[in-house]
UniProtKB/Swiss-Prot annotation:
GO terms for cellular component: small ribosomal subunit. The keyword Ion transport does not apply. With S4 and S5 plays an important role in translational accuracy. Located at the interface of the 30S and 50S subunits. It comes from the Archaea. One of its GO terms (molecular function) is rRNA binding. This is Small ribosomal subunit protein uS12. Residues 17-38 have a biased composition (Basic and acidic residues). One of its GO terms (biological process) is translation. The lineage of its organism: Archaea, Methanobacteriati, Methanobacteriota, Stenosarchaea group, Halobacteria.
Length: 142
């Protein structure tokens, strides 16, 4: 490693080159999150519900997690989104407009015992799903 009086240029260049060994830096610099993410880097996205699906939880849990298949309005991609809350799936019908967000797993991926589900439903027809489940709001008729 250069450490002389006039070594600043080489030190800087070496640092720039070695940064690419850090996988987090390389992914960020190449913009891979925006390229692979269905929401294209946005915090939330709107979509139309195509169907309700039940997804089996991974071992050792035994449950059918209630999810929906959503087609995003911005790019037409289809994703699976989890419906959090007891009986939340009953407030969601096909062709409803839902707002989805990341489910909050590590590195922007799936969370808990739900494999391949990276998103959760936050709103149905503009009303918060949590409010609907609690009974604080009514679902508007579209």
């Amino acid at each position: 490693m250069a450490n002389g009086k006039y070594a600043a240029r080489k030190l800087k260049k070496d640092r720039q080159n070695h940064r690419w060994s850090d996988s987090k830096y390389a992914r960020r610099a190449r913009g891979l999150k925006e390229k692979t993410d269905a929401l294209e880097g946005a915090p939330q996205g709107r979509g139309i519900v195509l169907e309700k699906v039940g997804i089996e939880a991974k071992q050792p849990n035994s449950a059918i997690r209630k999810c929906v298949r959503v087609q995003l309005i911005k790019n037409g991609q289809q994703v699976t989104a989890f419906c959090p809350g007891d009986g939340a799936i009953s407030f969601i019908d096909e062709h409803d407009e839902v707002t989805i967000a990341g489910i909050g797993g590590a590195k922007g991926r799936a969370m808990g015992d739900l494999s391949a589900v990276n998103y959760k439903v936050e709103k149905v027809n503009g009303v918060s799903l949590i409010e609907l489940v609690r009974g604080n709001a009514e679902k508007p008729v579209r």
